[in-house]
Curated annotation (Swiss-Prot):
SUPFAM superfamilies: SRF-like
Tissues of expression: Expressed at high levels in leaves, moderate levels in roots, seedlings and stems, and at low levels in flowers, pollen and siliques. Accumulates in leaf guard cells and trichomes. Also present in epidermal cells of roots. Expressed in mature guard cells.
Organism: Arabidopsis thaliana
Molecular-function annotations in GO: DNA-binding transcription factor activity; protein homodimerization activity; RNA polymerase II transcription regulatory region sequence-specific DNA binding; transcription cis-regulatory region binding
Domain K-box as annotated: residue spans: 86-176
Subunit structure, interactors included: Homodimer. Interacts with AGL15, AGL24, AP1, AGL6, AG, AGL1, AGL11, AGL5, SEP3, SEP1, AGL63, AGL14, SOC1 and AGL21. Interacts with AGL63. Interacts with SVP.
GO biological process entries: flower development; positive regulation of transcription by RNA polymerase II; stomatal lineage progression
Domain of life, per lineage: Eukaryota
Name listed for the protein in its UniProt record: Agamous-like MADS-box protein AGL16
Record SMART domains: MADS (SM00432)
Sorted UniProt keywords: Developmental protein, DNA-binding, Flowering, Nucleus, Transcription, Transcription regulation
Protein's UniProt keywords contain Transcription regulation: yes
UniProt-listed InterPro entries: MADS-box/MEF2_TF, MEF2-like_N, TF_Kbox, TF_MADSbox, TF_MADSbox_sf
Gene: AGL16
GO cellular component: nucleus
Length: 240
């Protein structure tokens, strides 16, 4: 359900009126500060509560804002007067010169110079500003260090992963070399076995060949003896 609109009229209840004033006042001052920072505008806000309490905000100094406002209002009434225009720009130059002087003075005080004329409250405010600035510098430095550490961690993880991959490749090459060595050894063993088998078969064949030759040579001697005996038998038969 949408939020209901508040009627723009005086709030009768004093408590509700005070709460609304506090919220709206803080919101207005916050918006004025944001406008001054975002748009580089010179802003001045003056608020008086129903009890007469003063609340104000100025981007530089309230006095310079009021003076500039008065000068601008005076310019509208005499914008066609050349002398008034010259006077206006002279005042603008004086205001800018004053602002530059204030900035230079603040810078020297931030550097720890020209502190002798400051009150305890002013020194406390200066210390608070320095602490805020130092906190911002430390936060930025810590953020940059964290980012650098994250980058280094990512690079370290990549290097570690590359080392793991390289180690796996080395192990794989070693395993392949072992398998190749085993295959070469098997082939050499087969060659040696075949060679031994050939040598053994050669010796057997040579022995068999020698025996065959001996048998062939012995056959004619047997036939010669048989033939001689046959002749002798025929001879004796003839005599008888």
């Amino acid at each position: 359900m949408g939020r209901g609109k508040i009627a723009i009229k005086r709030i009768n209840n004093s408590t509700s009126r005070q709460v609304t004033f506090s919220k709206r006042r803080n919101g207005l001052l916050k918006k004025a500060k944001e406008l001054a920072i975002l748009c580089d505008a010179e802003v001045g806000v003056i608020i008086f509560s129903s009890t007469g309490r003063l609340y104000d905000f100025s981007s530089s100094s309230m006095k310079s804002v009021i003076e500039r406002y008065s000068d601008a209002k005076g310019e509208t009434s005499s914008e066609n007067d050349p002398a008034s225009e010259i006077q206006f720009w002279q005042k603008e130059a004086a205001i800018l010169k004053r602002q530059l002087h204030n900035l230079q003075e603040n810078h020297r005080q931030m550097m720890g110079e020209e502190l002798s004329g400051l009150s305890v409250e002013a020194l406390q405010n200066l210390e608070n500003q320095l602490e805020l600035s130092l906190r911002g510098v430390r936060m930025k430095k810590d953020q940059m260090l964290i980012e650098e550490i994250q980058v280094l961690n990512r690079e370290g993880n990549l290097v570690h992963q590359e080392n793991l991959d390289l180690h796996k490749k080395v192990n794989l090459m070693h395993q392949q070399n072992m398998e190749l060595h085993e295959k070469v050894s098997e082939v050499e063993g087969v060659k040696i076995a075949n060679k031994n088998s050939l040598l053994t078969n050669g010796l057997d064949m040579r022995d068999t060949s020698n025996e065959h030759v001996h048998l062939q040579l012995s056959q004619p001697q047997h036939d010669h003896e048989t033939h001689s005996k046959a002749i002798q038998l025929n001879y004796f038969s003839f005599i008888a």
